[in-house]
Design a protein with these regions (language model features):
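Peptidyl-prolyl cis-trans isomerase
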Residues: 38-96, 137
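PPIase-associated folding chaperone regions across multiple families
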Residues: 1-38, 89-186
Length: 186
């Protein structure tokens, strides 16, 4: 389970929708990584400090990042979002080579710039999920992550073992001609 605070940076001009070429992506990633380095240098002790440092770094760097594609930032470009990601979320969203591993390698409070797919770059800081939510709030997610697959397998195996006997007296009480499909009558 990964809790991240992030700012999403599109790898395209938001006015013309012209995508960045490889050189432009590299330049944008370099600028975003410099912002992540400044967040790490700030060394925030609390999540609030880390989010403030991320927001400040984004406000200072986003105009330069957007300028690579001749774009302009909007009022909400530096808005920090928070997301709790499961391992399956990471696998499905972080599709760029090495992106998922980059997230997994971050320690709590560490910031990085990661290109997660062909059109999005994240400036993010990983935070401790228990510093944002209580254990009770996270309990179902933790259990699902830890034992969800085993539970699915156990339910499937138990279902496969059930006897498939039809109760003839129940069938005689309710013959098929008495069953009315309400959705077909409306």
């Amino acid at each position: 389970m990964y809790e991240i605070c992030y700012i999403s940076i599109p790898l395209y001009n938001t006015s013309t929708y012209a995508f960045a070429d490889d050189d432009q992506k590299a330049e944008m990633l370099k600028l975003a990584q410099a912002a992540a380095d400044s967040v790490n240098a700030a060394g925030g002790e609390t999540v609030s400090d880390q989010v403030s440092a991320l927001h400040e770094a984004a406000q200072n760097t986003l105009p330069d990042i957007y300028a690579v594609l001749d774009g302009e930032t909007s009022d909400d470009s530096a808005s920090v979002q928070t997301e709790l990601l499961t391992e399956s979320d990471v696998a499905s969203a972080f599709t760029q080579d090495g992106a998922a591993d980059a997230l997994r390698s971050l320690s709590y409070g560490e910031a990085a710039a990661v290109q997660i797919n062909s059109h999005t770059l994240l400036l993010m800081v990983r935070v401790d999920p228990l510093s944002v939510s209580s254990l009770d709030d996270l309990r179902s997610q933790i259990l699902s992550d830890m034992k969800g697959g085993e539970l699915d397998d156990a339910l499937a195996a138990g279902g496969a073992e059930l006897a498939h006997d039809l109760d003839s007296s129940a069938i005689n009480r309710l013959p098929a001609k008495k069953i009315v499909n309400n959705s077909a009558n409306s």
